[in-house]
Amino acid sequence: MSSNTPSQLTRDLRFFLTVPHGCSYLPDREATTLFLDPQEQPGQGVYDALALLGFRRSGRHLYRPHCEGCRACISVRIPVEDFTPKRTQRKLISRNVDLETRMLPAAFYEEHYALYARYIRTRHADGDMYPPSHEQYRTFLTLDHPYARLIEFRLQGQLLGVAATDLLSHGVSAIYTFFDPSPAFERRSLGTYAILHQIELARRLGRPHVYLGYWIRQCRKMSYKQDFEPLEYLDGRHWRRQIPLVE
């Protein structure tokens, strides 16, 4: 990555704010999102810098929360060298040792979409990603860029899960994971296993962090992120291992 600071690398970029809209995580609050100008085509260095500032990727868009009077969304990341799996996580790794993994470009694959659609219909029928569609999937998870990857998890050829991940110069960014919702595979905890796999990927690549997106104390759906210890939190400018005070 460039020796320039993240702020120096991004100061000439254009950003836009969305109008206030209902928060997907805290139903009693409104949210506003800061987006990088969609006309910008950020290279690796700019994306690296924005990730250090708490930005995430969704399809072609780089964004972060920018809500008036609310700082509940906190960017979190795992320091790879200091991470030691818990006993339950070690057992999970052993339980999934029979899975085959393969990394692919973040292109559209019909087999992936079919699994994604099953996952959304089964696990998130009450969310804003329902109903699934080809257009929604392409917009969300495909991107023709060298840093964007899809990791497949297969059992004897059967596709069980896919993790969308980005390769940063200073880490791996876990974008989204979807998996087979069948009860037969529940004990595999494929969502957790996908994160453990990305931690090991970062270790092999010599990348110091795995970025998990945002953590919200009041949101139970995000509580799993604190199962990965230690965890670093972005307090606005600095990454620290103490949870910041938020409103």
Curated annotation (Swiss-Prot):
Pfam families: ATE_C (PF04377), ATE_N (PF04376). It comes from the Bacteria. Belongs to the R-transferase family. Bpt subfamily. Disulfide bonds: none annotated. NCBIfam families: PRK01305.1-1, PRK01305.1-3, PRK01305.2-3. The gene is bpt. Transmembrane segments: none annotated. It catalyses: N-terminal L-glutamyl-[protein] + L-leucyl-tRNA(Leu) = N-terminal L-leucyl-L-glutamyl-[protein] + tRNA(Leu) + H(+); N-terminal L-aspartyl-[protein] + L-leucyl-tRNA(Leu) = N-terminal L-leucyl-L-aspartyl-[protein] + tRNA(Leu) + H(+). GO terms for biological process: ubiquitin-dependent protein catabolic process via the N-end rule pathway. GO terms for cellular component: cytoplasm. Keywords: Acyltransferase, Cytoplasm, Transferase. It comes from Chromohalobacter salexigens (strain ATCC BAA-138 / DSM 3043 / CIP 106854 / NCIMB 13768 / 1H11). Functions in the N-end rule pathway of protein degradation where it conjugates Leu from its aminoacyl-tRNA to the N-termini of proteins containing an N-terminal aspartate or glutamate. It is found in: Cytoplasm. Its EC number is 2.3.2.29. One of its GO terms (molecular function) is arginyl-tRNA--protein transferase activity. This is Aspartate/glutamate leucyltransferase.
